[in-house]
């Protein structure tokens, strides 16, 4: 990774994700987290102000040194204890199976190289009654938008840190062994190929579960 990926892209990412619309969406979902939380792709820590007092600890995973540096600063004002893990989400997480009450990922799954493997790690660490809270952009339902998502994704991955515009977020979550219990989809303000959003909650499923 070069200078752009290490130093420029993290600042662009922080700025792009720090606006009224994303703050509104964060405020709708992040307070639903409870107990021990794993935030996958914590980035610069923009979710931290939205965690409720019912969160005891947040484990924040991210591979970017620069984004974690920004997150450390925001963690100082967080209501919960925050511990950072610098690694990719699909790597084996140094957390015990069934030790996490809530997994949170916002605008993250698009950029994980091996998304199915990362989701398996999330499922592994969740308790049986745990929840996955997700806010992700991905493949739109409209053919005229999908055409552009497919055309732009190869270039977008190069300039956007591996971000895919065309991933089917709900299908990825279900295929990893989750049941989606709440799902809202919509276009957020902005260019449609980049802004179709999946927001919701999922729970892990197991063979024989009711």
Specify the residue positions occupied by each region the protein language model found:
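Core SAM-dependent methyltransferase catalytic element
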Residues: 185-210
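Short alpha-helix
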Residues: 161-177
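Class I SAM-dependent methyltransferase SAM/SAH-binding core
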Residues: 38-40, 44-92
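A short acidic, Gly/Pro-enriched loop at the edge of an enzyme's catalytic core
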Residues: 90-102
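Conserved alpha-helix/loop element of class I SAM-dependent methyltransferases that forms part
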Residues: 16-36, 46-47
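A short glycine-rich, Lys/Arg-flanked "PGG" loop and its adjoining helix->strand segment in the class I
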Residues: 116-128
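A short SAM/SAH-binding and catalytic strip from SAM-dependent methyltransferases
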Residues: 101-114
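Conserved beta-strand signature within the Rossmann-like core of class I S-adenosyl-L-methionine
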Residues: 129-137
